[in-house]
Every structure is written in C-alpha cells, then in structure tokens.
Amino acid sequence: MNKIAIITAALVGLAGVSGAQANSLGRPCTSAPESQWLSLEALKTKAEAQGYKVQKAKLSAACGEIYALDHNGARTELFVDPTSGDIVAKM
C-alpha cells in the first residue's frame, strides 16, 4: 500500500512540472516589433521544412508556439523567433 502512495505522489508531481513547462517559455523570443514578424503560416512552413508535422500554432508573448510531432511521431512544443522562424527552445 505504501508503494502505491509513493508512486502516485511521484506521478502527480511530474504531471505538475510538465504542465507548468507547457504553458509558455517564460521569456520573449524576440524584442523586434510585430511589424517585423513573419506570418503564422510562414512559421508553420519553416517548422514543416525541418521535419515537424504541425498540429497547432499560435503567437504568444513575442514567441511563436508550435505544437507538432517530430520525425519519430513524438509530441513536441517548439518556441520560435517570430522574426526568423529559428527554434529558440523545444519541450
């Protein structure tokens, strides 16, 4: 019974950490004005050119957030610089 409680507590803790990371990068990806940003479609195209299968994308807090599948089919969240499409972070 004690093992079940420990495993449950560990899983709950891990779920909280991954949920907190998935919300946002916590810092802007660029300081450039929005007039210099690429369109959301252009950001998605750049991610797809790198082998990602884009499922959803949005612009948030001066970052492009792209939810995609990598070449192995694993879910990933990409944070991209909206001025260039360069990947700044991957979770």
Each predicted region: which residue ranges?
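Classic N-terminal secretory signal peptides
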Residues: 1-22
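Cleaved targeting-peptide boundary
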Residues: 20-30
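Short, non-transmembrane alpha-helical segments in secretory-pathway proteins
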Residues: 30-54
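Conserved histidines in hydrophobic membrane contexts and catalytic metal-binding motifs
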Residues: 47, 55, 60, 66-69, ...
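Glycine-centered tight beta-turn/hairpin loop motif at sheet-sheet or coil-to-beta transitions
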Residues: 71-73
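Short, mixed charged/polar active-site loops
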Residues: 75-77
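A short, surface-exposed interaction/processing loop segment used at functional sites
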Residues: 85-91
